[in-house]
C-alpha cells in the first residue's frame, strides 16, 4: 500500500492536500555502532527518508528519518532513527498532527523494499601512469559518453545498463530510536514566529512522542530513559513499557562505545567525543555513560527523553523493482541540496514557502 493511500484516508476531504515523500538511494556508510577489529564487521547501508504534508503548496509538517541496515552473512539488523520532526504553524488545520505522523512513521519503519548494489571493493591496482600519453588515452575512452549530445550521433541506439542488486538475508531485528528535546524549531527556520505553531514543554513533548510510538510498536520491547529523572513517572502511564534503555543486550555489561549507536546531531555522540579526548572511552560502561549523560548541558533544564524500541521478527527484504515504483528515489546530493534550501527559507512568510514548493515541484516533473 502506498503512503498516499494511507494518509489520504485520514485527511479531511475539504482541502487540497499533497504528500511530499522521498528516499535517498541506499549508500554504504560507517556503522553507527563502533565495532571492534576482532569481530566481524557487517556492511552498513544508510537510507534517508523525508516526508512533508502540503496544503495548497504550503508546508504543514516535516519528518526526517534515517534508516541503517547492518548486513551480516545470514541476517540484517535495522536501526531507525527519527532525526527531526517539525511543524510550520502556517495553516489552521482540523486534524491532529500525530494522526498523520503515526502512519507515516510506521510506513518508514516497515518499509523493506530496498534495492542495494554490491559494495565496490577497494582497488589494489597500482596507480596509473601519469604520463600525457596515458592521460590522453583515458580521455579518449570517455569521449563516446558525449556522443548523444551531438546531432551527428543522435541515431545511436540508447545504452542499457544491467544493474545487479544484492540478494539480502532476512531481517532479524528492528530498533527504533527517538531523542526528544524541546526546541522552538527543528526543520523550519522562523516558524516559531507563527501564531499557529504550538510550542510545548519537554515533558509534554515526551508524552506526545510516547503516545505515537505506543500505537505503532504493539508487541515490541519498549523502553524509556529520562536522564536525571525517574523514567517510571512517564512509563506508568502506558502499558508494556519499561524503565531503561535498549543498548545492553547481554547479562554482562558491555562498554558504551561498542553498544550505543551514534547518529547525526546526537548529544550522545558529542559526549562520546569528549570521552575520547579525556581518554576514558575504552573503560566507560553503559551504566556509567548513562549516569554521566544526565549532567551534560543538553540534558539540563527541561525534560529530555531517550525512547528505544526493539522488534525481533524475521522478515524478508525485498530486492525487486515493484516495491520502489511508488517511492521517489533521489541522490544524496539532491537530498542535501533540498535540506539546505529549506534552511534558507523564512517560514514566517507563507509566500516564500509557496514559492519554494512551487519551484521544487516544477523542477522534479
Q: What is each model feature region?
A:
Residues 1-7:
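Eukaryote-specific long, low-complexity intrinsically disordered regions
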Amino acid at each position: 500500500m502506498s503512503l498516499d493511500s494511507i494518509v489520504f484516508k485520514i485527511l479531511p476531504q475539504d482541502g487540497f492536500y499533497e504528500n511530499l515523500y522521498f528516499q535517498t538511494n541506499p549508500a554504504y556508510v560507517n556503522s553507527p555502532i563502533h565495532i571492534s577489529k576482532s569481530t566481524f564487521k557487517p556492511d552498513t547501508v544508510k537510507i534517508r527518508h523525508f516526508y512533508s504534508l502540503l496544503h495548497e503548496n504550503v508546508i504543514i509538517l516535516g519528518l526526517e528519518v534515517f534508516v541503517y541496515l547492518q548486513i551480516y552473512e545470514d541476517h540484517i539488523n535495522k536501526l531507525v532513527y527519527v532525526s527531526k520532526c517539525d511543524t510550520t504553524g502556517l495553516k489552521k488545520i482540523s486534524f491532529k498532527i500525530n494522526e498523520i505522523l503515526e502512519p507515516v512513521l510506521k510506513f518508514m519503519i516497515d518499509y523493506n523494499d530496498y534495492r542495494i548494489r554490491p559494495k565496490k571493493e577497494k582497488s589494489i591496482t597500482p596507480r596509473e601512469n601519469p604520463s600525457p600519453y596515458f592521460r590522453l588515452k583515458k580521455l579518449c575512452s570517455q569521449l563516446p559518453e558525449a556522443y548523444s549530445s551531438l546531432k551527428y550521433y543522435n541515431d545511436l541506439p540508447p545504452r542499457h545498463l544491467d544493474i545487479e542488486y544484492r540478494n539480502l538475508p532476512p531481517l532479524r531485528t528492528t530498533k527504533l530510536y527517538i531523542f526528544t528535546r524541546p526546541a522552538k524549531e527543528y526543520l523550519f527556520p522562523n516558524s516559531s514566529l507563527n501564531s499557529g505553531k504550538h510550542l510545548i514543554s519537554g515533558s509534554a513533548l515526551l508524552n506526545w512522542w510516547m503516545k505515537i510510538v505506543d500505537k505503532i510498536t504493539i508487541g515490541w520491547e519498549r523502553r524509556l530513559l529520562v536522564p536525571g529523572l525517574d523514567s517510571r513517572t512517564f512509563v506508568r502511564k502506558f502499558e508494556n513499557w519499561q524503565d531503561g534503555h535498549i543498548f545492553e543486550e547481554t547479562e554482562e555489561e558491555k562498554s558504551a562505545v561498542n553498544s550505543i549507536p551514534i547518529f547525526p546531531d546526537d548529544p550522545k555522540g558529542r559526549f562520546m567525543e569528549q570521552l575520547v579526548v579525556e581518554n576514558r572511552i575504552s573503560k566507560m560502561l553503559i551504566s556509567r555513560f548513562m549516569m554521566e549523560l544526565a549532567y551534560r548541558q543538553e540534558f539540563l533544564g527541561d525534560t529530555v527523553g531517550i525512547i528505544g524500541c526493539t522488534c525481533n521478527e524475521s522478515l524478508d527484504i525485498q530486492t525487486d523493482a515493484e516495491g520502489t515504483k511508488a517511492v521517489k528515489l533521489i541522490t544524496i546530493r539532491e537530498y542535501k541540496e533540498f535540506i539546505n534550501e529549506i534552511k534558507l527559507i523564512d517560514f514566517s512568510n507563507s509566500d516564500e514557502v509557496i514559492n519554494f514548493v512551487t519551484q521544487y515541484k516544477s523542477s522534479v516533473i
